[in-house]
Swiss-Prot record:
Pfam families linked: Complex1_49kDa
Domain of life according to the entry: Eukaryota
Main location: plastid
Gene Ontology terms, MF aspect: NAD binding; oxidoreductase activity, acting on NAD(P)H, quinone or similar compound as acceptor; quinone binding
Protein's membrane topology: Peripheral membrane protein
Name of the protein in question: NAD(P)H-quinone oxidoreductase subunit H, chloroplastic
Compartment list: Plastid, Chloroplast thylakoid membrane
GO BP annotation list: photosynthesis, light reaction
Length: 393
């Protein structure tokens, strides 16, 4: 038996799982030939918390605080998809005012997510300055969230049939002021970054994905639109009231890391356009919160009442999920966030399958980094934009 010659000069290194550039607890086993990447294997699961199984033992209103822990930088989208599923299952109509408020919150959340992508991405490729700049705008955004929802992150704001509370007095003017200020901030980022020769050297032509290849891998969001595919669920599905606003799908045809950066920068400007139109055209009427009305209709248990002893054993009043199945999706900052829901004539879902965009976008990483340099791994991984909370669930 002849033993094949083993190459002695290949080096296997671990990147992560607790490295600042890993964007969470991601571990990469990288095989190197000098500086060239021969192979890369992502190791997942360090942040797995059984989110799908938890959903099967909770009513929707009980489960809402959990979903903000998937993508903890864009929590409004996880809340939106969680209430959209039972709304479609039960044919629940959302009032126009509540729909406008949802769109405003979703787009503010998209900007917050893209900002917190931009800073670490620039830090990954060696530019520290934008990392500190993004926190100015992010702080203003979180002030708006706190005023409207009571929380800076993990907002728990969306409800079946509407939102938890109406916008407070003066909030709309404050938000319009932020929009005007933020547009100047985006111009500043573009001056600082977009034509910077060192930045272009690091990202141009790095991590190329063609349009057909992107579709075959099931990519979505900026990863797909940067490869020349004009696919945005806000235009395709027309959920909430996006079709009432004038805005453009941001896309590029180059398919490299620079194109993905340009798509996200453009999306922030488009989000501001949507928010301004929604704020100026927001109608009156109810913001609706069906769960609150359901709670208000229940009898308060007396201290010595028979029911009081069993109050912790009873599920909170909620909607029965009819015995059918459906798939709902929204255009999250990272791509298509979907829920496959199976009802069983119970207040608990029979199956709650999460389709996270980060998990599917991450699958192409080993192919993108092959035959690239070691330093390009951080550029490519950063341009994909993953959050391990939603990857591992």
């Amino acid at each position: 038996m002849t033993v094949p010659d083993a190459r002695k000069d290949l080096l296997v290194v671990n990147m992560g799982p607790h490295h600042p550039s890993m964007h969470g607890v991601l571990r990469l086993i990288v095989t190197l030939d000098g500086e060239d990447v021969i192979d890369c294997e992502p190791i997942l699961g360090y942040l797995h918390r059984g989110m799908e199984k938890i959903a099967e033992n909770r009513t929707i209103i009980q489960y809402l605080p959990y979903v903000t822990r998937w993508d903890y930088l864009a929590t409004m989208f996880t809340e939106a998809i969680t209430v959209n599923a039972p709304e479609e299952l039960g044919n629940i109509q959302v009032p126009k005012r509540a729909s406008y408020i949802r769109v405003i919150m979703l787009e503010l959340s998209r900007i917050a997510s893209h900002l917190l992508w931009l800073g670490p991405f620039m830090a990954d490729i060696g530019a520290q300055t934008p990392f500190f700049y993004i926190f100015r705008e992010r702080e203003l955004l979180y002030d708006l969230f706190e005023a409207a929802t009571g929380m800076r992150m993990m907002h728990n704001y969306f409800r079946i049939g509407g939102v938890a509370a109406d916008l407070p007095h003066g909030w709309i003017d404050k938000c319009l002021d932020f929009c005007d200020y933020f547009l100047t901030g985006v111009v500043e980022y573009q001056k600082l970054i977009t034509r910077n020769p060192i930045f272009l050297e690091r990202v141009e032509g790095v991590g190329f994905i063609g349009g057909e290849e992107a579709i075959n891998w099931g990519l979505s969001g900026p990863m797909l639109r940067a490869s020349g595919i004009q696919w945005d669920l806000r235009k395709v599905d027309r959920y909430e009231c996006y079709d009432e606003f004038d805005w453009e799908v941001q896309w590029q045809k180059e398919g490299d890391s620079l194109a993905r950066y340009l798509v996200r920068i453009g999306e922030m400007t488009e989000s501001i356009k949507i928010i301004q139109q929604a704020l100026e055209g927001i109608p009156g009427g109810p913001y609706e919160n069906l769960e609150f009305r359901r709670f208000a209709g229940t009898k308060d248990s007396e201290l010595n009442d028979f029911e009081y002893r069993f109050i912790s054993k009873k599920p909170s009043p909620s909607f029965e999920l009819s015995k059918q199945e459906l798939y709902v999706r929204v255009e999250a900052p990272k791509g298509e966030l979907g829920i496959f829901l199976i009802g069983d004539n119970s207040v608990f879902p029979w199956r709650w399958k999460i389709r996270p965009p980060g998990f599917i976008n991450l699958q192409i990483l080993p192919q993108l980094v092959k035959r690239m340099k070691l330093a390009d791994i951080m550029t490519i991984l950063g341009s994909i934009d993953i959050i391990m909370g939603e990857v591992d669930r």
